[in-house]
Amino acid sequence: MQVNIAPSWKPYLEEEFNKPYFEQLAAFVKAEYKSNTIYPPAKQIFNAFELCSFDNTKVVILGQDPYHGFKQANGLSFSVGKEVRMPPSLVNIFKEIESDLGHPVPTNGDLTRWAQQGVLLLNATLTVREKQPGSHQNKGWETFTDTIISILSQHKQHLVFMLWGNYAQKKEVLIDTSKHLVLKSAHPSPYAADRGFFGNKHFSKANAYLVEHGLTPINW
């Protein structure tokens, strides 16, 4: 399994990579890529950590599983490649940004530009079998990504965590809310967006918090 991450993550994660659970996870993932169609492409599994360094992280947006459709997942939660049709949840995210900040909906759903500004687009599970949502859950990824959240909470100051939906909100227990901002709402999926995602103004709230603490806001 290729672990491509920005250098500033390495002091915090090298110990994690050597733990027995991660070695078992890596063996499982390697075998899965050999025998099945797995997303994202192997070289993009750690894309979130390659594009958004530990030092640069300002905002964390937590997803659950990578997209499981053809060529959708690119290693960033909610993001898709430029040539791929935007999934409904991502369309709703852009609709909320348009309502909140007045930014027009972009022509593609590649969120690389967010990651490069310090938005860690983190799925709880980093791989999935094609057309089998949840197929790589409970194999060790959640242990790893929970550790990421805990490390960020412990070692960083004034982060914004966006927790959308019940699954993501369960991760709040890992976050020190006395020194970070946690924003919670319904999930942006079409089944839930009308129950509190639309109108949550998370993007303007995040930027106001960053500016308040002397940090550059995100160009959403």
UniProtKB/Swiss-Prot annotation:
EC number of this enzyme: 3.2.2.27
One of the GO BP terms on file: base-excision repair, AP site formation via deaminated base removal
Enzyme class: hydrolase
SMART domains attached to this UniProt entry: UDG, UreE_C
Keywords: Cytoplasm, DNA damage, DNA repair, Hydrolase
Active site, renumbered: 65
A Gene Ontology term for the protein's cellular component: cytoplasm
SUPFAM superfamilies: Uracil-DNA glycosylase-like
InterPro entries: UDG_fam1, Ura-DNA_Glyclase_AS, Uracil-DNA_glycosylase-like, Uracil-DNA_glycosylase-like_sf
Taxonomy, superkingdom: Bacteria
Subcellular localization(s) per the UniProt record: Cytoplasm
Keyword hit for Oxidoreductase: no
Matches recorded under PROSITE patterns: U_DNA_GLYCOSYLASE
Record carries keyword DNA repair: yes
Catalytic reaction equation(s): Hydrolyzes single-stranded DNA or mismatched double-stranded DNA and polynucleotides, releasing free uracil
One function term, GO molecular function aspect: uracil DNA N-glycosylase activity
HAMAP family named among the record's database cross-references: UDG
Family under the similarity heading: Belongs to the uracil-DNA glycosylase (UDG) superfamily. UNG family.
Functional summary from the UniProt entry: Excises uracil residues from the DNA which can arise as a result of misincorporation of dUMP residues by DNA polymerase or due to deamination of cytosine.
Protein name as it appears in the record: Uracil-DNA glycosylase
Organism: Amoebophilus asiaticus (strain 5a2)
